[in-house]
């Protein structure tokens, strides 16, 4: 069983606490993106990043000095968004950390696909960003089916805990025989069950921790998840989507 998650915009460096396992599988393609980013001026990058001046300045300076071989942080420790705070990889048990290194993958606009303990450097490039590299105008075009091919190299079950922006890079290439399970986290609002972005990020992080720390390997075991009021609801679920409702 493999688990996929989204990255986070907010990143940190921690080159001392944990060892990296290897470099990203698509580091060469990340180098192409880095060269492209370095060819842009400040205003062009700010437009690509769609952010304020403070964030643009931080990331512009990062791009100028970026080296994909030095001062690397394990990927799962490098992001610090809501999902990662809920996941708490810094305090994983040793067994959960080993399982993460083997089965947890992060889909990235810049690196393509990352193993949890792959060594990376802070960057900013969302999957929905527009690019102009050869005849490619989106990162979905740039990555093509390479992320999908790497993820399904072993034909394993994939549990999707990524947002649509990132899972889209895989879902468009899925074949009928591919095992791809979506986990959705919803709560009632005005008589309807809806997924709220912030609450879903928190729940996805909780689910990752639940799977890793309980060494879960089967879909039926995932259904036992009950954290922060969420319960599996079979009446809303299908063969390809597990729906959890917060009461």
Curated annotation (Swiss-Prot):
Q: Which domain of life is it from?
A: Bacteria
Q: Which residues cross the membrane?
A: none
Name a GO CC annotation attached to this entry.
Answer: cytosol
GO BP annotations, alphabetical order: response to hydroperoxide
Record-stated family:
Belongs to the UPF0246 family.
Q: Which NCBIfam families match?
A: PRK02101.1-4 (NF002543)
The identity of this protein, by name, is: UPF0246 protein LSL_1719
- The record lists the organism as Ligilactobacillus salivarius (strain UCC118)
